[in-house]
């Protein structure tokens, strides 16, 4: 199953489970603390795919399942942003707060810890590197503050910066990102695999 811009692209199986794993396919057994297990058990929602304004999108036929994530009220979460969001949600769920951080397209690294300490990006000139100014009050490391931090990341990160952060994979597996960096680029994330009739699916 591929996660692409918040849609699960796969054959249209009928799923009765609360997660996004395929019901007819025996999935791999993974460590409950692992990235793969987290992806296999993303919360599923029923109903239509909605845009950031709460309106059903036109095409409701290109997905297998719908993740039950609130995307907020701004048009910020595109394909790379969705992957950034899910990775951050995983690290948050594991309480690995110090590992949450992403590069902007121009190469500047910005961590959630810096955001919580009040540092905000400042642009000296268009296309230049950011400096950071202590311009806000300290924030606790809560899920609400994570969402606010990610809104900043979405604005300045994308497939180009995400591609530079990733390592090449020898094989496709759960958690593998398939990415085409560019302006625009695109990326997808494998969230499950299994065995059907003795073959990898």
What are these regions (language model features)?
Residues 166-173:
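Short, well-ordered loop/turn sites that connect or cap secondary structure elements
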Residues 9-10:
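C-terminal motif of bacterial Sec signal peptides marking the signal peptidase cleavage site
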Residues 73-166:
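Extracellular-facing segments of soluble proteins and assemblies that are Gly/Ser/Thr-biased and enriched
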Residues 186-196:
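Short beta-strand-centered aromatic/proline hotspots
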Residues 1-3:
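Sec-dependent signal peptide recognition
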Residues 179-187:
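Short coil-to-beta-strand transition motifs
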Residues 199-201:
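Short solvent-exposed strand/turn elements
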Residues 13-61, 65, 70-78:
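N-terminal module-boundary/linker segments of secreted carbohydrate-active enzymes
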